[in-house]
Design a protein with these regions (language model features):
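Catalytic alpha/beta core domains of metabolic enzymes, predominantly
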Residues: 84-174, 180-190
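Active-site beta->alpha loop and helix N-cap motifs at the rims of alpha/beta catalytic domains
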Residues: 2-82, 115-118
Length: 190
């Protein structure tokens, strides 16, 4: 399960930390990613330490950049030094992956690549994901995550380019039952 401040607002929740605690009751010991919402080194470090203290199964989501476009690499380095489970999010380019891999290579961090948004830009996200997965798997013990899926078939794309994790909306997950239908049968259901 992954959660961020924009999903928090979209779902109408009132208190981010209370909502995170509520989610932890349902997820038990499964991996959960909660994102910091600060936009400075100090805020991110403070929030990451607090979020990770809520449970051992939490991966703290750190965006690859601050809102001003500057790298959060120093934040990532600090949190790796303090053994915080990390999910580096909002990745779009191979250059971004190459920049963080030396710091993350010996961790079990998650690298969240926004494949759906890459597609939205007119670039073939399958090719980009495959190349980024080659970088990740070739020089680290990190896991890759296909984020921001746009269609059910993204699940197949994620498998075919060797992605470890995919996040999908509930609507997309329920549509996966259609994978078992022949196209003829599917057309009759339309």
């Amino acid at each position: 399960y992954t959660f961020n401040p924009s999903l928090f607002e979209k779902n109408g929740a009132k208190n981010y930390i209370n909502h995170c605690k509520k989610i932890l009751k349902y997820t038990k010991n499964k991996p959960v990613s909660f994102e910091v919402f600060g936009d400075s080194y100090e805020e991110m470090i403070k929030q990451a330490n607090f979020l990770s203290s809520l449970s051992k199964n939490i991966y703290v989501k750190i965006p690859i950049t601050y809102t001003n476009g500057q790298s959060t690499l120093k934040v990532i380095e600090n949190l790796v030094d303090h053994n915080i489970n990390l999910n580096i999010t909002a990745i779009f380019t191979r250059k971004q992956v190459k920049k963080i891999l030396p710091t993350l290579k010996d961790t079990n961090s998650i690298i969240s690549i926004f494949a759906g948004r890459i597609y939205d830009s007119g670039v073939d996200a399958f090719i980009e994901m495959r190349e980024m997965n080659n970088l990740i798997k070739g020089s680290s013990s990190c896991k890759s995550l296909w984020a921001s899926s746009r269609m059910v078939y993204d699940f197949i794309h994620a498998i075919n380019c060797n992605t470890d994790i995919i996040t999908m909306s509930y609507d997309h997950i329920t549509k996966m039952k259609n994978f078992k239908l022949s196209l003829k049968k599917f057309s009759l259901n339309t």
